[in-house]
């Protein structure tokens, strides 16, 4: 469903980090991969600091490797840039690729290093064998 009903509510709840609302909507059948009116999926607009929201979305089938059509950023790029190691680890465990570049040729590790997130950069280097 494009931008309506519980699917639109799911993106909003995910963006606000509302764990219980996300859980209720998913259990009621909301599509974890539905796009909102801006063309973004809940996993792309979720509050990156909420690893619980990420876990719920992924548990219900959210695609961890969905790319923004304009920037080619994926949720791992956002988590790395913003400094959310727990969320990044949840995404990686669910199959998110760490070796894909955004539209500017940057990997998640590049974004972590640019922002001074050393713990995330270490994790990404270790996870990719780099």
UniProtKB/Swiss-Prot annotation:
GO biological process terms, semicolon-separated: cellular response to cell-matrix adhesion; cellular response to nutrient; cellular response to transforming growth factor beta stimulus; cellular senescence; liver development; megakaryocyte differentiation; negative regulation of cell cycle G1/S phase transition; negative regulation of cell population proliferation
Residues bearing the modification Phosphothreonine: 12
The organism's place on the tree of life at top rank: Eukaryota
A cellular component annotation (GO) from this entry: cytoplasm
Keyword Phosphoprotein: yes
Tissue occurrence: Expression abundant in lung, less abundant in testis, barely detectable in liver, and not detectable in neonatal kidney, adult kidney, brain, heart, or spleen.
Endpoints of the signal sequence: none
Record's keyword terms, sorted: ANK repeat, Cell cycle, Phosphoprotein, Repeat, Tumor suppressor
Pfam annotation, one family: Ank_2
InterPro entries with a match to the protein in the record: Ank_Repeat/CDKN_Inhibitor, Ankyrin_rpt, Ankyrin_rpt-contain_sf
Subunit structure: Heterodimer of CDKN2B with CDK4 or CDK6.
Function statement: Interacts strongly with CDK4 and CDK6. Potent inhibitor. Potential effector of TGF-beta induced cell cycle arrest.
Protein family per UniProt: Belongs to the CDKN2 cyclin-dependent kinase inhibitor family.
Name of protein: Cyclin-dependent kinase 4 inhibitor B
Organism taxonomic ancestry: Eukaryota, Metazoa, Chordata, Craniata, Vertebrata
